[in-house]
Amino acid sequence: MRRPLVAGNWKMHGTHSSVAELIKGLRQLALPSGVDVAVMPPCLFISQVIQGLAGKAIDVGAQNSAVEPMQGALTGETAPSQLADVGCSMVLVGHSERRLILGESDEVVSRKFAAAQSCGLVPVLCVGETRAEREAGKTLEVVARQLGSVIDELGVGAFARAVVAYEPVWAIGTGLTASPAQAQEVHAAIRAQLAAENAEVAKGVRLLYGGSVKAASAAELFGMPDIDGGLVGGASLNADEFGAICRAAGS
């Protein structure tokens, strides 16, 4: 049975003092024992969060890492080896904001996935369609292409040590949420694509839903058979709301 995972993506939010307050709130949460929980703060707060959450059952990850695994001459980037060194356990790759705003291609995303995994980090591969792509009936085609790029480059076995997050771009930061049925359709297609290559890998990989996840909608989403938790954006900046989402995953 797949163990649920709820990961909070703080995006480009926080100051030293506000992060300290959020850490305090997270430490006070009573988290369900059967759920893995992680937060992904901005890079410059990672060490603060790791130290602040020491002893609490919350993993810390990063929102991005470089295409090269080891440190070197790549100004402004952070090597996955450096993230592993400070105590990160996972990293987002291919988030839609980086694909759309910063122009990261499927090829770049695949390279980041490989680099992160080579350093012992768990890549959380983000896939999803824009509103225009959904309205054109291309949702499953787009997601299959994004997932297939990594499979073609690294083989399906790489997903035995990875997580996939489906995040419909039209639902991110908009307040809109895919219905449980819409989300399940895509999650089932992702698992089927993996199963076509390796049934055991497909059975074990955790698939998260991301896209304006709130406590009020979480339980119904997480009740779908192929949804194994959530990649939570804005709601993860509120400790109580985030805790409620984690409890929904445990129910």
UniProtKB/Swiss-Prot annotation:
So what does this thing catalyse? Answer: D-glyceraldehyde 3-phosphate = dihydroxyacetone phosphate
Identify the enzyme class.
isomerase
Coiled coil location: none
Q: Which GO terms describe its cellular component?
A: cytosol
PROSITE patterns recorded: TIM_1, TIM_2
Q: Which family does it belong to?
A: Belongs to the triosephosphate isomerase family.
Question: What highest taxon heads this organism's lineage?
Answer: Bacteria
Question: Which InterPro entries does the UniProt record give?
Answer: Aldolase_TIM, TIM_sf, TrioseP_Isoase_bac/euk, Triosephosphate_isomerase, Triosephosphate_isomerase_AS
Organism whose genome encodes this protein: Pseudomonas aeruginosa (strain ATCC 15692 / DSM 22644 / CIP 104116 / JCM 14847 / LMG 12228 / 1C / PRS 101 / PAO1)
* Name this protein carries in UniProt: Triosephosphate isomerase
The annotated active site, in chain numbering, is 95, 167
> Where does this polypeptide localize?
Cytoplasm
Transmembrane segments annotated in the record for this chain: none
Molecular-function GO terms, alphabetical: triose-phosphate isomerase activity
